[in-house]
Amino acid sequence: MTATKMNAQEIIQFIANAEKKTSVKVTFEGQLATAVPSSVVKLGNVLFGDWKDVAPLLEGLVENQDYVVEQDARNSAVPLLDKRAINARIEPGAIIRDQVEIGDNAVIMMGSVINIGAEIGAGTMIDMGAILGGRAIVGKNSHVGAGAVLAGVIEPASAEPVRVGDNVLIGANAVVIEGVQIGSGSVVAAGAIVTQDVPENVVVAGVPARIIKEIDAQTQQKTALEDALRTL
């Protein structure tokens, strides 16, 4: 299976060297007494920027000193992914960090969490509440079920990430442990905990997960994906 495009040391250095930011949106009443620096965006009576740059402007308010601060992070090293150029369906409420790759016609459902360095292949669906940890790889035309967890590996840096092949179905609330590889065409049953590599074209189930059968025509029919859900 393919290696991740960012290895653990590269991600660690990316986070360590990134400027830590507390991004805020501030709505205020009154007139700012000082000029707005280039690091802050002002649209009407709304300011966007890092708190360390915005806070001094609020101290200079004259007249009414009313303002509301909205923030969702503190000293964050990794911003959220800019999704505007992604050719995929991404539903509201999905949390996707920067340095994530998403293939064409993938589907990212609400409540899913995708960490830095993860890679999602074309046509793959990440269902509601699923978690892809750092550097996790999912191939093409696969399905990661609701609430499933693909464990992430950023530290220790020597550990291997989860790798999921093409045309794989991972059932709801399944857990795939760090370093495990799931072969293409396989099915992981709902609630399974996968602690060892899974070969291609088998069904695994249980805690810990074990092979219970090879993929047959009936299994393929029951686990077939719906292309219509991936239409943009």
Curated annotation (Swiss-Prot):
UniProt keyword Disulfide bond present: no
Catalytic activity of the protein: (S)-2,3,4,5-tetrahydrodipicolinate + acetyl-CoA + H2O = L-2-acetamido-6-oxoheptanedioate + CoA
Pfam families cross-referenced by the UniProt entry: DapH_N, Hexapep, Hexapep_2
GO molecular function, one term: tetrahydrodipicolinate N-acetyltransferase activity
Keywords: Acyltransferase, Amino-acid biosynthesis, Diaminopimelate biosynthesis, Lysine biosynthesis, Repeat, Transferase
EC identifiers of the protein: 2.3.1.89
One BP term from GO: diaminopimelate biosynthetic process
Family listed: Belongs to the transferase hexapeptide repeat family. DapH subfamily.
Listed name of the protein: 2,3,4,5-tetrahydropyridine-2,6-dicarboxylate N-acetyltransferase
Species of the source: Streptococcus pneumoniae serotype 4 (strain ATCC BAA-334 / TIGR4)
High-level lineage: Bacteria, Bacillati, Bacillota, Bacilli, Lactobacillales
